Regions:
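Juxtamembrane extracytoplasmic/periplasmic/luminal helical "stalk" adjacent to the first N-terminal
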Residues: 9-12, 16-80
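Amphipathic alpha-helical regulatory segments at dimerization interfaces
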Residues: 53, 67, 87-97, 130-131, ...
Length: 258
């Protein structure tokens, strides 16, 4: 009889032990997931803030270009077609655009065609041709990536009295203002990478800031509005040691503790 009671007590003890262990492990999982969810939420907010800064900068630059392109003097320069006059106007416009490294006024000969005398590189020429054939604004693009002449281009139409494109105002900007906008949103220990979609469905990194975080950190992707760019952000926040690592180890530790 005494042995039977002892066996029952031992079985009850084991059941209680397993219940406590299961409850402890469930609590661990809940805390771990809650912490990861918190990190992911903060990372998403940070990436969105950086994307918003990029969008704000691009919007301001495009609006300045559209305002300048709407001036009668700009249309007159394009219509007269005097190279020296056009170069002076380009220099004047460049001085009005913070961060601009070059400005071109490009007359339009016909649908999708540009004068052969224009000394544009192949990427910029392709960009302008797509601008000339589009009914909506074309997203800015980085060109000469990795070279000393690296820049991103924004182009707007210069319209005549009938609101038809007479040419295009092309502005090339240094990456510095864009990089500064990203740096303002980058927290300590974080890593941000701005990537541009290429023609072959590949992505190319155009700006990388911070240090690549270790595995296990929150990583999110955000897309600035009206762009071909994607922003990738790694927060650098790592779960505390007690909430990371081998879960079997913690399960065994709980059993021993109980």
């Amino acid at each position: 009889m005494a042995q039977s009671l002892t066996r029952v007590h031992f079985q009850v003890f084991l059941i209680l032990l397993l219940c406590f262990a299961a409850a402890g492990y469930a609590g661990y999982l809940a805390m771990h997931d809650l912490q990861l969810s918190s990190y992911q939420h903060r990372a998403s907010q940070t990436a969105r803030a950086a994307s918003d800064r990029i969008t704000e900068l691009l919007t301001q630059q495009r609006q300045r270009l559209e305002k300048i392109a709407g001036q009668p003097g700009v249309l007159g320069v394009l219509q007269r077609g005097v190279p020296a006059e056009r170069e002076r106007k380009e220099d004047e416009i460049k001085s009005m655009l913070p961060g601009a490294v070059a400005v071109r006024l490009l007359p339009r000969n016909g649908p999708g065609t540009m004068p052969s005398t224009e000394t544009l590189d192949r990427a910029c020429l392709d960009f302008i041709r797509r601008v000339s054939m589009a009914n909506t604004p074309v997203a800015p693009e980085f060109h000469a990536i990795g070279a000393a002449t690296e820049h991103y281009d924004i182009a707007v139409a210069v319209r005549d009295e009938n609101r038809k494109p007479a040419g295009y105002l092309l502005a090339s900007f240094a990456r510095a203002p864009l990089q500064s906008a990203i740096e303002l949103a980058l927290p300590p220990g974080g890593y941000m990478e701005l990537q541009q979609a290429m023609a072959d469905d590949q992505w190319q990194t155009v700006i990388a800031l911070g240090q690549v975080a270790s595995a296990g950190t929150a990583s999110v992707v955000s897309t600035p509005s009206d762009s071909r760019w994607t922003l990738m952000f790694q927060s650098g926040e790592v779960p505390s040691a007690i909430l990371s690592g081998n879960r079997i180890f913690y399960f065994a530790f709980i059993l021993l503790a109980l």
